[in-house]
Amino acid sequence: PERPSGARPTQVTKSITNMKATKESKYNALFNKLIDVNDLLNRLIEIAKDLEYPIFRKNDKYPINLNIWGIRSKSTCTKHYNDVIVMFYERDFNIWECMVFEATTDPSNLNLETPVNNKGCAVLREGVHKALWKIGKHKGQYKALVQANPCQVIRDNNRDDKIDITDNTDFGMFGINLHRASSWKVSDEIGLYSAGCQVIKDVNQWNDIIIPLFDKAIGKGTQSYVLINEMDLDL
């Protein structure tokens, strides 16, 4: 996909999943804080410029040149969905579509306390993960974004319910997917749905909005991912 031109958006179109159209979350303070989608998108583009992260823009080859960014909450709670995933693309020159979803970018407390890997839980490292995903099936069950290329994770192996960001890193194919939580209910608690994957809380948003977007934007290609921290936003 095309590298950013450096231009900042002058207008952001409002979508049915922007902050103003979504009820306040009980546990996700970060989600509630991101009221103005236009300001959020401008801030993400500023961060991308400062850190030399890619911002994909519309072009002839990619009419929907999708950007997916995760924002990890500064909260250490891993029981509830307290992070967000932002999906945005340039619909026309400097006219952007921006959608923000409640999510987790961390393993849940249950998986941290009882990791499935003897090295410890995989916590996706913040930064750019180029061509991380492709469309596939999560655990062979339903359409999702599945890991297509190796990535770097942090191994958290002290078996408490808090995320520990250390230098204990690992690199490889770990099944770090982007998928939904429950297929039949929307719960505030992560449960066992994340052992390191990026997980969208709301199955209705997943089925009605996200999967159709993936089909149009990604197809048989790959999708990069940027993960930052709430503190990067300087809110």
Give the predicted meaning of each segment.
Residues 20-191, 205-212, 219-223, 230-232:
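Cell wall/extracellular polymer interaction/catalysis modules
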Residues 1-14:
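Short, positively charged low-complexity motifs
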Residues 11-18, 23:
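N-terminal compositionally biased, intrinsically disordered segments and leader/signal-like regions
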